[in-house]
Amino acid sequence: MKRLTPALLAVCLACSFSPAALAAEAQQTRAFRALPADFIKGADISTLLDAEKHGAKFYNHNNQQQDPIAILKADGVNYVRLRLWVDPKDAQGQGYGGGDNDLAATLALAKRAKAQGMKLLLDFHYSDFWTDPGKQFKPKAWEKMDYPQLKTTIHDYTRDTIARFKQEGVLPDMVQIGNEINGGMLWPEGKSWGQGGGEFDRLAGLLNAAIDGLKENLQNGEQVKIMLHLAEGTKNDTFRWWFDEISKRNVPYDIIGLSMYTYWNGPISALKANMDDISRRYNKDVIVVEAAYAYTLENCDNAENSFQAKEEKEGGYPATVQGQYNYIHDLMQAVADVPDQRGKGIFYWEPTWIAVPGNTWATPAGMKYIHDEWKQGNARENQALFDCQGKVLPSAKVFN
C-alpha cells in the first residue's frame, strides 16, 4: 500500500451528503461471464477491530446493526485477508495505529472470519508496521541481527506464528510471505536492489527460510497456499524482472499476488495483459490481493483523502457508488478471464475502514517508526464499502 495520508487537512464534510442519495446511484447491476464457483471474493478487514474499539458501528442493507463480517458474507464475500505486524508499539507501549495488528488482534479477527465460514489469507509483513515498495523496516527486536541470524529468526517466527494459529483453530488457508516486496524485505539485508550484488540470493534465502518455517507445521495433508506479492500490478517488466530472479533460485510458491489501484497504476486492461503473461510464464495462479476505489469525493473526517478529483480522473471510473461497483465488477471479470483458469480472485482493500475518531493510519509513535511524519486520521474512508455512518453500500452487492 502506498503512502496513506496527504499532508494537508480538509474541512469535515461528513454531513454534507446524503447516504440515501449515494445509495440510489448503484442500482444498475451487471452479470459476470463464467465466474468460477470457487472464485475468491475477498476483503482485507485488518483495521476493523481497532475501528470498533473506537466506536464504529455497522449496518446492513436493512439499516439493522450487525457484525460487518456477517454483512460482507451476506453480500458474497468468502475470504478475509489480515495483515500481521511483529510488535506494533514503541518502548513505552504506545501503539502504532493502522489497526494495531499484532498477533492478538489478528487472531481475534481470524476467529470471527472463520466463524462466518470464510477462508483466511494471512499477510506476514515481517515488520512492526506498514511495508510497501518504499519501506521494509526490520522489527525492532531484529534490527541488530546479521543475515544468518535473520534467516533463523524469520524461520522460527513464521513457524511459531503458524503453530499458534493452528492451536487456536484458525490455520490460514493462504499465506503471504511479505507484503508488496518489489524492493525485497527486511532491509537492507533482504533488499532486492542497490546492495552491491547478491541481492536476490539473500532475498531468496529469507523467503525460503520463512517458507520452511511455515511448512514445519503442516501435517496429515494440511495445505496452505503460498503467495508472493508485488505492488503495481500493471508493470509487466517489474514482475518479469522479480519473478525471473526468484524462479532462478527455486523459491517454492503457488500464487502471484498483485496490488492494483487504477488511479496509481493504470487501466485494468494493462493489469489483464500482465496477469495473462506471468501466469503462463511462471505457470502460477494470480490473485489481485489489493484493490479499492472511491464511492464519493466527500470527506468524513479532517484528514484529506488520498483519492480526490485527480485520482477520479486518472482512475477511469466516476467516484460514485455505481462507479465503485463497476470498478470491482470489471476487476473481477478481468481476473476470471485469465487463461487456463489461472485467475483465482480479488481482495478488496479495507471495506470496513470508515472514519472513526481515534482510529488513525498511524499514531505519532507509528510515524516515527516508519520515518513518515504526517497527519493523523483516515485518508481512505471514501474507498470503503460502508458509508460514513457505517451503512453498507449497494456496491458491496457486486460480490453476489
Regions found by a protein language model. Give the residues of each.
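Glycoside hydrolase catalytic-domain groove-lining segments
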Residues: 62, 66-69, 201, 215-225, ...
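Acidic-and-aromatic substrate-binding clefts and catalytic sites of carbohydrate-active enzymes
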Residues: 51-52, 56-63, 88-92, 96-104, ...
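Conserved, mostly hydrophobic/aromatic
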Residues: 43, 72, 123, 175, ...
